[in-house]
Amino acid sequence: MGKLATLNGILKDEASQMKLNVVHLCSSVNAKTIDLALLKATSHTSNNPPSDKYVTFLQSTIDTCYGPDTVDAILHRLRVTTDVCVAAKCLILLHKMVKSESGYNGEDSLRNNINHRTLIYTQGGSNLKLNDLNVNSSRFTRELTPWVQWYKQYLDCYLSIAEVLGITPNIKEKNEDKRLETQRVSSYPMDCILKQIDFLVELFEHISDRPKAPQSKLNKIVIEMTELMVQDYFSAIRLMRIRFEELNVRVAKPNELVPVLEKLENCKEGLSEFSWRSKYLIADFWYLVSKLKDM
């Protein structure tokens, strides 16, 4: 950051702090602490992603009575800011809030958090709104802006998948997680499984269409966005594989999958950058895609 931009950021953060003190004159200590942590996590004076210290604290509120207030406060800050970095940090925070449920417990875990998620995504409509961002304040913001715009659309897609699947797409490489999900999918009708696959493929397409990496290799905000996205990619592979295997058991030749498989293969090159992160998972998945296509 340049000296002028840094000074401007400091003044904005101090103004936000003063406003917070006035707003919370009659509020509870917990409400003020949440808003203060949000300001610290999304400060104007740093080009780094939200600090783990504040992220962990904000995540800890999600399963409490303050959870909706936390999500609503992040959404409000996202809507009113014109700062590209602050908007990026708000989106990262929202992504982490959604992913923060403890373990994978199927539909019940999502049902407990439904009020939090529906603050962001309700009945097909997204509450993720970007303000008119000050794009040209620096080279850093010019590089970051296309990522912020893409990431907002990506989160819309991610949340719509949670709506259709009935679970947050955050399944890990655990036998119990896969057993629970396989059991759920086995009870679904064919058209339901095909619809879910369509939405998962859309996530693949969004990942494949991400912006080019910034020339500044040390853009830690983009690195954080990418890391969260890759985690989602691996979860989506596990979810899709379970559905492909279920269809493979039910029908000899699932013709309805042909267009979907072609879309997937069109994404393959754009996703190859991440193959080294989980070679066996990736290789097994693309082998299954080829096998289904050749049936």
Swiss-Prot record:
<keyword id="KW-0968">Cytoplasmic vesicle</keyword>
<feature type="domain" description="ENTH">
    <location>
        <begin position="26"/>
        <end position="169"/>
    </location>
</feature>
<keyword id="KW-0472">Membrane</keyword>
<dbReference type="InterPro" id="IPR045192">
    <property type="entry name" value="AP180-like"/>
</dbReference>
<dbReference type="InterPro" id="IPR011417">
    <property type="entry name" value="ANTH_dom"/>
</dbReference>
<dbReference type="GO" id="GO:0072583">
    <property type="term" value="P:clathrin-dependent endocytosis"/>
</dbReference>
<dbReference type="GO" id="GO:0030136">
    <property type="term" value="C:clathrin-coated vesicle"/>
</dbReference>
<dbReference type="InterPro" id="IPR048050">
    <property type="entry name" value="ANTH_N_plant"/>
</dbReference>
<dbReference type="GO" id="GO:0005543">
    <property type="term" value="F:phospholipid binding"/>
</dbReference>
<dbReference type="InterPro" id="IPR013809">
    <property type="entry name" value="ENTH"/>
</dbReference>
<keyword id="KW-0333">Golgi apparatus</keyword>
<keyword id="KW-0254">Endocytosis</keyword>
<dbReference type="GO" id="GO:0005905">
    <property type="term" value="C:clathrin-coated pit"/>
</dbReference>
<dbReference type="InterPro" id="IPR008942">
    <property type="entry name" value="ENTH_VHS"/>
</dbReference>
<dbReference type="GO" id="GO:0005794">
    <property type="term" value="C:Golgi apparatus"/>
</dbReference>
<protein>
    <recommendedName>
        <fullName>Putative clathrin assembly protein At5g65370</fullName>
    </recommendedName>
</protein>
<dbReference type="Pfam" id="PF07651">
    <property type="entry name" value="ANTH"/>
</dbReference>
<keyword id="KW-0168">Coated pit</keyword>
<dbReference type="GO" id="GO:0048268">
    <property type="term" value="P:clathrin coat assembly"/>
</dbReference>
